[in-house]
Design a protein with these regions (language model features):
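Extended glycan-interaction surfaces of carbohydrate-active proteins
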Residues: 1-81, 102-155
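Functionally critical, mid-to-C-terminal surface segments that flank or help form catalytic/ligand
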Residues: 82-86
């Protein structure tokens, strides 16, 4: 029952995507997690449309905002690093692995000389911002690397 309510009230026909709030129209990159959390299957058209809407609305160059609406700190100015990894994972789930891999390689290049990433990345410069090193960002990198990797069966 709860799933039905969420799908009815969080889906925006206007945006053709799952939104950040019930009966709302604003996008949030956290909706990229509906597939890995098992809420929607990768072949569900609502997942594909949500990924496409988020890519169109929240992606700037190689990075993603989590959302673009003002919060307690104002309008976001930097990309939330883990969101780009969530997007990479969504691309892989949709069968767009080459696109995901290219973006993953770009993100790898953003790490410092030790391969560490920060919480945020400045959109214009690629400079690391925010909490550093950021566990969320590094876990996102690891998860994406696993999703992009060839299985042991295929590799052997």
């Amino acid at each position: 029952r709860l799933r039905e309510i969420i799908l009815k009230r969080a889906w925006s026909e206007k945006r053709k995507a799952l939104t950040s709030t019930f009966d709302g129209h604003e996008l949030d990159a956290s909706m990229l997690l509906v597939e890995p959390l098992g809420f929607l299957e990768a072949d569900d058209p609502r997942f594909r449309m949500t990924v496409e809407a988020i890519g169109k609305d929240l992606k700037r160059g190689d990075f993603l905002f989590r959302y673009v609406v003002a919060d307690d700190f104002g309008r976001p100015e930097t990309a939330f690093t883990i969101c780009t990894f969530w997007y990479i994972d969504a691309l892989v789930a949709l069968g767009r692995g080459e696109e995901g891999r290219a973006l993953f390689e770009t993100m790898l290049a953003r790490g410092n000389k030790h391969g560490l990433l920060s919480e945020d990345i400045a959109m214009a410069t690629g400079e690391l911002w925010g909490n550093y090193p950021q566990t969320y960002s590094l876990v996102g990198l690891i998860n994406s690397a696993i999703k992009l990797s060839v299985s042991w069966e295929v590799a052997s």
